Swiss-Prot record:
GO MF term set: adenylosuccinate synthase activity; GTP binding; magnesium ion binding
Role played: Plays an important role in the de novo pathway of purine nucleotide biosynthesis. Catalyzes the first committed step in the biosynthesis of AMP from IMP.
Similarity comment text for this entry: Belongs to the adenylosuccinate synthetase family.
Binding-site list for Mg(2+): D13, G40
Organism name: Rhodopseudomonas palustris (strain TIE-1)
Name of encoding gene: purA
Subcellular locations according to the entry: Cytoplasm
Record: residues binding IMP: D13, E14, G15, K16, N38, A39, G40, H41, T130, R144, Q224, T239, R303
Name of the protein in its database record: Adenylosuccinate synthetase
Disulfide pattern: none
Translocase recorded as keyword: no
GO biological process: 'de novo' AMP biosynthetic process; IMP metabolic process
């Protein structure tokens, strides 16, 4: 019986939410292990649409335990707002089915303000963050001045911790020409929220260890994508956390041996939000058409996603850096009807052919894709639930992707609906 880690194999927005929800039916526990409320996902269940940002997908399934791990940065107000919205849709959320790591780092309003100030000041050099305070919160965590959930349980020592945090942030704000923050206001806000947050607090590493020893199935839910990893992504156009599969262990307090099967999610084409290199980007009518068909707009921000052909070089690289055992290929139906589709099989960099994305920012911007043209298919793949329902040419496309990235397709998604999924290999039984 394997635990399963789900990671994005591209730049995020690959359809992880649907796949995690589909897998969560077989899991006992669903765990978020990195990121914050900057990476939203949409789930469609029985015709009802749910939009999640911070909460694990497991909250939508009765009898499942959802967990937010220590690797997440946690915005208390965003959490309370999301819980209220889901409860309004009839979703039961309480400490009975949701636990939050007591040592999770909190995102405060000052983090959001700093994030926005930096992005706006950078102008053309902006990274393209969601301005939700994710990066500044991780900075405070590494700088050992962050406020953590457990700190709200001791209001006697909390003022000292707030003062230590503000010694840093007020110095920054003075330099940016912004008014200083009053420690009393932060203390009042956190004190007011504490009774609503602390009932969820848990020693998550211990909880998960106990559950694992009991034989419970654990599903680790990654946010964003491996190409946004702060170390292995397209730096500096990345997020502020590690998004590769190994973070599932660090971000929950479980040992690497508990991780198990790694499932990488990727679209049948490529998208990216925000700035940064994108070798296969299509700025023509085809790119626009893919975006229209795929409804490529951010769940949280509404930002338009950049679209391009499938990049086998990048996905192959992610397969290696994440140790991916199988892929879940999504949105194959978006390519229905094209006369032909292109797949990037390599790059040219300064006249030389290479089979990987270099780490340097300048080199990443200069690489040129080498394409292989594959015949398209006219018959629809949408809503298919078996290989027999797929056009022969669509199957050839999937098989070619497997060859190029060196990894089998374990799941194939043909619509946003949970049931429209073709299972090749069950990750929990691999």
């Amino acid at each position: 019986m394997a635990n399963v880690v789900v990671v994005g194999a591209q730049w995020g927005d690959e359809g992880k939410g649907k796949i995690v929800d589909w897998l969560s039916e077989q899991a006992d526990i669903v765990v978020r292990f990195q990121g914050g409320h900057n990476a939203g996902h949409t789930l469609v269940i029985n015709g009802q649409t749910y939009k999640l940002a911070l909460l694990p997908s497991g909250v939508l399934r009765p009898s499942k335990l959802a967990v937010i791990g220590n690797g997440v940065v946690f915005d208390p107000q965003a959490f309370l707002d999301e819980v209220k919205k889901l409860q309004g849709q009839g979703v039961a959320i309480s400490p009975e089915n949701l636990r939050i790591a007591e040592n999770v780092t909190l995102i405060l309003p000052l983090h959001r303000e700093l994030d926005a100030t930096r992005e706006n000041a950078a102008k053309a050099g902006a990274i393209g963050t969601t301005q939700r305070g994710i990066g500044p919160a991780y900075e405070d965590k590494v700088g050992r001045r962050a406020i953590r959930l457990m700190d709200l349980a001791d209001l006697d020592t909390l003022p000292t911790k707030i003062e230590r945090l503000l010694a840093h942030h007020n110095a920054l704000r003075r330099g940016l020409g912004q008014p200083e923050i009053d420690a009393g206001q932060i203390l009042a806000d956190l004190s007011a929220m504490a009774p609503h947050l602390l009932p969820y607090a848990e020693s998550v590493w211990r909880l998960l260890d106990i559950k694992r020893r009991e034989g419970k199935r654990i599903l680790f839910e990654g946010a964003q994508g491996a190409l946004l990893d702060v170390d292995h992504g397209t730096y500096p156009y990345v997020t502020s956390s590690n998004t590769v599969a190994a973070q599932a262990a660090t971000g929950t307090g479980m040992g690497p041996g508990a991780v198990g099967y790694v499932l990488g999610i990727c679209k049948a084409y490529t998208t990216r939000v925000g700035a940064g290199p994108f070798p296969t980007e299509l700025t023509n009518e085809i790119g626009e058409e893919i975006g229209r068909r795929g409804k490529e707009f951010g769940v949280n921000t509404g930002r338009k996603r950049r679209c391009g052909w499938f990049d086998a070089v990048l996905v192959r690289q992610t397969v290696r850096t994440c140790g991916i055992h199988g892929l879940a290929l999504t949105k194959l139906d978006i390519l229905d009807g094209f006369d032909s589709v292109e797949v990037c099989v390599g790059y040219k960099l300064d006249g030389k052919e290479i089979d990987y994305l270099p780490a340097g920012e300048g080199a990443q911007a200069r690489v040129e894709p080498i394409y292989e043209t594959i015949e398209g298919w006219k018959e629809p793949t949408a809503n298919a639930r078996s290989w027999a329902e797929l056009p022969a040419q669509a199957i050839k496309y999937v098989r070619r992707i497997e060859e190029l990235v060196g990894c089998p397709v374990a799941l194939l998604s043909t619509s946003p609906e949970r049931e429209d999924t073709i299972l090749v290999q069950n990750p929990f039984e691999a």
